[in-house]
Regions:
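Enzymes that bind and transform nitrogen-containing heteroaromatic metabolites
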Residues: 1-197
Length: 197
């Protein structure tokens, strides 16, 4: 069965965005450090290449997410993020929404059905694993439904004091690996501990 993998940037104090969705803190660590940037890009490309389907929440899909990465893939060959942009552009993407039936983006489908049922059906399809890019609400719903199989949390050496969390209730995870980058970010890979263990 395919795994559902979550990749998400988090602050030291456990938020994935500021109170109003701000994400500027993601760029504070290692600003201008090209070696650290290449490390992060390498990690992102490797994780994305292990998957052939990306899941998005409605808010992220309705933003400029798809058009931004399409532009990088097609018009910016010198951009260090170009290899990741090509994967994002060319892979199947599914946006979950209760209100939208179409959203802009190449290889983007909109799913209006039950989240748990749809994700479980995707996991049972043949293919590579599935990667989640999403906002706090969408990811929080996936976590609450126990749908995430692997968590790749990129901990930034930044605290913002208040913001949006992804964990709405107690969740016990087991650390499988940890990788520190030169600019101070740390990628922790966690897997869920089965209830009752």
């Amino acid at each position: 069965m395919r795994k559902l993998k979550l990749q998400m940037q988090v602050t030291l104090d456990g938020f994935v965005a500021g109170p109003n969705g701000e994400g500027d803190w993601v760029f504070l660590a290692g600003k201008g450090d090209t070696e650290a940037l290449q490390q992060m890009i390498g990690f992102g490309v490797e994780l994305a290449a292990s998957c052939d389907t990306f899941l998005l929440g409605r808010k992220l899909a309705a933003s400029s997410f798809c058009t931004y990465w399409e532009n990088v893939a097609e018009n910016q060959p010198e951009n260090p993020w170009n290899p990741l942009a090509k994967l994002i552009t060319n892979h199947r993407k599914i946006a979950f929404s209760h209100s939208e039936t179409t959203l802009p983006g190449r290889n983007l489908e909109v799913e209006n059905g039950n989240l748990a049922t749809a994700v479980q059906a995707l996991k049972e399809q043949p293919g590579k694993d599935i990667l989640v890019y999403g906002g706090a609400d969408f990811v929080g719903s996936l976590i609450s439904l126990n749908l995430i199989d692997e968590y790749y949390l990129i901990v930034n050496p930044v605290a913002i004091g208040a913001g949006l969390p992804i964990f709405k209730e107690r969740k016990v995870l087991e650390l499988e690996s940890s990788m520190a980058f030169k600019h101070g970010k740390i990628v922790n890979k966690y897997v869920p501990v089965p209830v009752g263990s």
